[in-house]
Each structure stands twice: as C-alpha cells, then as structure tokens.
C-alpha cells in the first residue's frame, strides 16, 4: 500500500501519526477528565432524548395539525432496538463534540512543541465574540425551523399522505434523521451574515462578487434547499425565502463593513454621535414611548388577537410590575438609540462611498452632467457597459436641452466602444481558451491511446466519434428536449400531487377480492415524512423519460443516418413510437387487469394464513404495482424494440455479441430508478435480460440465424 503513495504523502501521514501520538501522550494524565466530559455529554444526551427531546419533537410535529390529522400520525419503532440505538448514536456524537475541546486544550503543549498551535493576532475577546455570534445565529436559524417551518411542513406532509389514503406512521429513525438534517441546514444557512461579512472584510471574496452574483446565489439557495426539503413548492419557498432575505441583509451588512473599512480614517463614530445628539435622543425617547404605549394602551391585546387569527399559540405577556415596564421602556430607548446611530453612520459611509466612486471609478461617471468636451474626453470605460437604449436616452435628453453636439458626441463614443467590443469578441472566438484547448488535447490523447492512433468504426475510437457527433447534433435542440421533459414531469407530478395517486390507489384496490381490501387487512403506510412525495417525483421522472425518448430519437435521427448507424428515414420515428406505445399500453393493461391483482392477492392471502398484520410501505407497494403493470409493458417492448432496431440497420450479430454491455446498462438504469436495494435491482434486470433473450430468439427466426437481417447492417454497401 505504501508503494502506491509518493514520498511527500508518506511523510505527511507519518507526521500526522506522530502528532496524534504526541497529543495522546501529552493528554495521558488528563484522559480521565476528558472521558468524564465525554460521559457527561453522552449520558446527558441519552436521557435528555428519552425524557424531553422526543416529546418536544412530537409536539413540534403535531403543532399545526388538526385533531383528525393528528390522530392518524404516529411515530413507530420498526425493530426492538431502534430507539435505544438511535439515542446511543446521537449521544456518542454529542459526547465526542463535548470531549474534543478539552482534549485539544490538555494536549496543547504537544501541539505548541510541533508548531501546530495557531498563533492568531486576533484578541481572545474578539474570537469569543465571533463564537457567540455564530452560536446566536445558529440558534436563530434553528428557532425558525422548529417554531415556523417544521409545524407547517409536517402538517402539510401528513395531510398529503392521508388525503392519498395512506397512514403517516413515521419510523423514529427516519423521522429523527429528517428533523436533524433540516435543523443542520437551517443552522448553517443562518451563518450567512457572519460568513459573507467576514469574507468581504478579509477580502477573501470581494463584496462586489456577492453583489453582482446575487442571481446565482438565489438559484444556489433553491438548489441547496431542494436537497433538504420536500419537493413541493410550498415548503421549498418556506425554506428559500428566509434565506434569500438573510442573503440580502448579509449583503447590506457586508457593504457597510467593507465601506467602513475602506474609509475608516474618514469616519468618526464619536463625532457623528456628538453632532447629532439631539436627533439620537429624540429617537430613543420616541421608541421608549412606543414601547410604553404598546403595553399600556391595548397593544398586547391587539398583538395576541392577531396571533390567534393566524392560528398561533404564542402570546405576548404584559410586564408584571411597574419596574419591569420601566425596564422594557429603557431597553426600547437604547435599541432606538443604537438603530439611530447606525443609520447616521451608514449615511456618512454612503456619502464617502459616492465620493470615492465619483473620483476613482470611470464606469460610474455621470455622463449627463458633462458637456461636449467632457463627453469626448471621457475614458472609454465610461461607455463600456452602456446599452444602446441608455445612450439614446442620454442623447434625447441632450437634444431636449438644445445641445445637439453633445448628443452626437455621445452616439459617436458609444459606436467606438461597440466596435471595440466586437473586435475583442472576434479575437476571443479565433483563439480557443486555455481550458478548451486542454480539454481537446486531453480527449484526443485519451482516444489515441485507446485506439493506438487508428479510429476504426468498431473500436472505442469509432464509438467515441459517433457519440460526440450525435450529442453535438442534439445540443441545438436541448431547449425543446428539456422543456418537453419538464412539462411532462410537472404535469404528471401535479396530477399525482392533487389526488391522482389516491384515484389510482382506490381503483386498484377495487380490483382486489373483498377479503383483502378492508383497512384492517391491508394498510399502506409512510415511514418517512417525504415518502409519498418522493415516490411521486420518481414515478413522474420515469414517465417523463419515456415520453421524451421519442422526441430525442426524432432530433438525433439525421445524425444517426449520417453516421450510417441506421438506414431508415426520420418518419420511421412515428412508426416506432406507435409500435412501442402499443406494446407498453398492451402490457400495462394486461398487468393492471390480471397480473398485479393476482400477485397482491396471493401475497396478502399468504400473510393472512400466517395470522400476520399486513402493513406495506408506500414505495414498496407502488413499485410492486408498477413492476407488475408498466413492467409487463416494458418487457413486451424489449423484443419489439430489437426488431425495430434490426429494421433500422442494427444487425442481429451485434445485438448478440453486445449482450454484456446491455446488461451493464440495464443494471445502471435499475440502480437509478428503482428503490435502493440490490435485490430490487436484480429483480428488474433479470426479467429485462430474459426479454432480451426472447428478442434474440425472435430475431434468430426472422433473420434466419442472422444471415438475412431485416435491413442492411451498418456499414453495408447500399
């Protein structure tokens, strides 16, 4: 193993081992104390979960549910050890986190001896302030999750499952993982103000980058939220909107901090406060009086009535004494004073920023304030980012003022800047970029090594050329392909989401014998809060892929003909689509009418004979229905597709010789679109390969053992 690592890597690993050993030796006499801290964290977490946390989580889960929904929601343990093992795992993680700081502290001597102890020029109190800020922001994000997001999300998910005819019986493991994952996501997202401000202040990431790339940030926020939240728009918006607002606040805060840093010598907070002391005092008094009026003149009652109107259980409490009321008033006055001072300082910062921009940034030059000579003498950067409509507006304003020479000068300077931009763009197109050039060389070298400099049509070089040509021909039509895919996906998901899955469920149960239909005999449950929605997304994706394949075939058909892969004309796509759709629908009708009900009935009756309580997961139940309905149609389509491919020029011998590649491809597709189980993957792959074998048998008969294909093979003379 060591021979596989270079010398530098081996030295780094050895140094790490020595450092870890030195830390353990240095902390050896204090390991008992570290273990006690670990034990406190472990046992404290274990019993806190048992006595308080699970009940708190259950309360958060059902906070916004009405009585009918709440009565159907239950948290279950699938195995006897689920609860205790989950508590132990969480306790271990918390215990390690508790023990890590004291372990590092007691081993600091070894780290200092190896010069691995950080030497920060930042004062300890500043580090403590940053740490407290991080904790406060994390707590604020978690509070939003527990008191706003989770109650509405769980109520929505439970109602969605019940309306579809399922029972929300959440596994405690999956339920806890869902809560902890979203808790972590809210906690991390709440660090945006500190992260953006710190990066901008340290100039690691310029503030201008955060400001200019805000559209990319919004897309990233929604993408990040899609990984953690349910796939419905409501909960994604509830997650993304607060984070977007937090990004805007962070951007504002970063601007203040960066501008203050750049002009720190020209801003005097004390002088600003002294100059405007009367204004600050007035703001503090007004805010204090508003707090007093809120508590003394019906503000508490109005606020509580508003909270009750939106279904919230939270209430404002009136202070218990005059002393407490006075403290609230004084605190409100100081808060108003702080905000007033912050506003005045920010106003000074903005004035300074405008002054600096006006002096040093030619792109911010105000062209409307210049005369003819000023326009002609302005730097080219002042016109570089202007649009034509902006220049015409400036020229029109100059004409309205009677200055036609200035209007003509503006247009002339804009034309010059436009010509420079076009010349730069032409030069950029003529010279390939460094990354593109490297990619081309790397791809060419890779294919050349595999093909030994020759690109025969039947080796990997020939396949690479074919695939690259086909993909390139499809790129120009990618908008139509993606648009059609998304349309089918959204339509199917919307139908399932708005009650379609319940209609399918009820119709299918109506085809089962009466003995296996009562709820006490056959029950379908959701073990994960998002299980029903995830199944709807996967099923919609499969249908969208099937609906998009004919469109893809239509667009790539000319490229396939040009590469001599197929020989039929493009109108053949319609024949193919009709034949495959007929096979799919015929197999689906057969499976939905006879195969699926027979299989479900057999399984249920077998379980009833053993006196078992039958409870199926949503995913397992509906994937079973899918495989025994649409799966029959897909199996029927395999021989049909093979015959069609043979008529298009794919020879019988090629299909027979390439069965290994087909097997690997089907395994990969099964791994993506079926439940995460090796057994299920093989249960899908084996029938499809059996159908592939049937197709080979049919082609063997039709082509007389491969001697007479239904169409000339690829590469044959026309």
UniProtKB/Swiss-Prot annotation:
Alphabetized GO MF terms: proton motive force dependent protein transmembrane transporter activity
Q: Where is the signal peptide?
A: none
Q: Where in the cell is it found?
A: Cell membrane
Where does the record place Acidic residues bias? 425-434
Q: Does the keyword NAD feature in the UniProt annotation?
A: no
Transmembrane stretches in the record are 34-54, 84-104, 137-157, 178-198, 214-231, 234-254, 280-300, 325-345, 478-498, 539-559, 572-592, 621-641, 661-681, 682-702
GO CC, sorted alphabetically, is: TAT protein transport complex
Which Pfam families does this chain map to? TatC
The UniProt similarity line reads: Belongs to the TatC family.
Family annotation (HAMAP family): TatC
Q: What does the record give as the function of this protein?
A: Part of the twin-arginine translocation (Tat) system that transports large folded proteins containing a characteristic twin-arginine motif in their signal peptide across membranes.
Q: Quaternary structure?
A: Forms a complex with TatA.
User: What is the protein's given name?
Assistant: Sec-independent protein translocase protein TatCt
């Amino acid at each position: 193993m060591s021979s596989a690592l270079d010398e530098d890597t081996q030295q780094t690993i050895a140094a790490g081992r020595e450092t870890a050993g030195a830390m353990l030796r240095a902390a050896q006499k204090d390991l008992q104390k570290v273990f006690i801290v670990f034990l406190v964290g472990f046992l404290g977490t274990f019993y806190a979960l048992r006595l308080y946390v699970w009940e708190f989580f259950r309360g958060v889960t059902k906070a916004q549910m009405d009585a009918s929904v709440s009565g159907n929601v239950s948290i279950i343990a699938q195995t006897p050890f689920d609860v205790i093992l989950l508590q132990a795992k969480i306790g271990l993680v918390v215990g390690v986190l508790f023990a890590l700081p004291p372990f590092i502290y007691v081993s600091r001597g070894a780290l200092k001896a190896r010069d691995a102890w950080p030497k920060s020029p930042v004062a300890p109190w500043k580090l403590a302030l940053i740490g407290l800020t991080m904790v406060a922001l994390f707590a604020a994000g978690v509070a939003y999750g527990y008191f706003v997001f989770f109650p509405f999300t769980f109520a929505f998910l439970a109602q969605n499952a019940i309306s579809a005819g399922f029972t929300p019986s959440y596994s405690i493991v999956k339920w806890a993982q869902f809560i902890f994952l979203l808790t972590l996501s809210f906690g991390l997202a709440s660090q945006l103000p500190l992260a953006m401000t710190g990066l901008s202040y340290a100039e690691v990431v310029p503030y201008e980058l955060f400001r200019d790339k805000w559209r990319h940030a919004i897309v990233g926020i929604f993408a990040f939220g899609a990984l953690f939240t349910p796939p419905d728009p409501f909960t994604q918006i509830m997650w993304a909107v607060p984070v977007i607002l937090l990004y805007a606040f962070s951007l504002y805060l970063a601007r203040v901090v960066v501008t203050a840093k750049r002009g720190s010598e020209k801003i005097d907070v004390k002088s600003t406060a002294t100059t405007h002391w009367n204004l600050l005092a007035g703001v503090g008094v007004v805010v204090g009086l508003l707090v007093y009026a809120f508590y003394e003149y019906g503000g508490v009652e109005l606020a509580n009535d508003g909270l009750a109107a939106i279904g919230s259980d939270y209430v404002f409490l009136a202070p218990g004494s005059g002393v407490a009321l006075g403290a609230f008033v004084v605190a409100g006055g100081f808060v108003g004073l702080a905000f007033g001072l912050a506003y005045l300082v920010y106003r000074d910062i903005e004035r300074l920023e405008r002054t600096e921009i006006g002096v040093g940034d030619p792109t911010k030059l105000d062209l409307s304030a210049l005369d003819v000579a000023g326009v002609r003498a302005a730097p080219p950067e002042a016109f570089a980012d202007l649009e034509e409509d902006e220049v015409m507006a400036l020229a029109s304003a100059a004409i309205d003022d009677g200055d036609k020479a200035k209007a003509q000068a503006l247009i002339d300077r804009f034309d010059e800047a436009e010509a420079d931009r076009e010349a730069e763009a032409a030069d950029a197109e003529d010279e390939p970029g460094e990354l593109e050039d490297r990619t081309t060389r790397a791809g060419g070298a890779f294919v050349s090594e595999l093909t030994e400099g020759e690109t025969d049509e039947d080796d990997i070089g020939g396949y690479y050329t074919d695939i690259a040509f086909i993909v390139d021909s499809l790129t120009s039509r990618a908008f139509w392909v993606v648009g059609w895919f998304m349309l089918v996906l959204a339509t199917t998901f919307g139908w399932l989401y708005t009650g379609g899955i319940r209609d399918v469920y009820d119709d299918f149960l109506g085809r089962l014998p009466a003995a296996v239909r009562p709820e006490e005999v056959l029950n379908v449950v959701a073990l994960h809060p998002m299980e029903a929605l995830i199944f709807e997304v996967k099923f919609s994706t499969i249908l969208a892929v099937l609906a998009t394949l004919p469109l893809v075939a239509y667009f790539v058909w000319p490229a396939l003909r040009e590469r001599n892969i197929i020989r039929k004309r493009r109108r053949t796509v319609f024949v193919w689509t009709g034949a495959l759709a007929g096979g799919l629908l015929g197999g689906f009708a057969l499976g939905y009418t006879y195969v699926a009900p027979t299989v479900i009935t057999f399984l249920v009756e077998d379980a009833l004979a053993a006196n078992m309580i039958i409870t199926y997961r949503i995913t397992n139940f509906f994937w079973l229905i899918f495989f025994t309905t649409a799966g029959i149609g897909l199996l029927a389509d395999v021989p049909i597709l093979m015959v069609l491919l043979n008529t298009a020029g794919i020879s019988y011998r090629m299909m027979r010789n390439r069965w290994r590649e087909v097997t690997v491809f089907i395994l990969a597709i099964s791994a993506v679109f079926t439940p995460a189980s090796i057994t299920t993957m093989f249960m899908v792959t084996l029938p499809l390969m059996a159908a592939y074998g049937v197709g080979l048998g049919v082609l063997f008969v039709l082509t007389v053992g491969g001697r007479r294909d239904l169409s000339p093979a690829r590469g044959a003379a026309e």
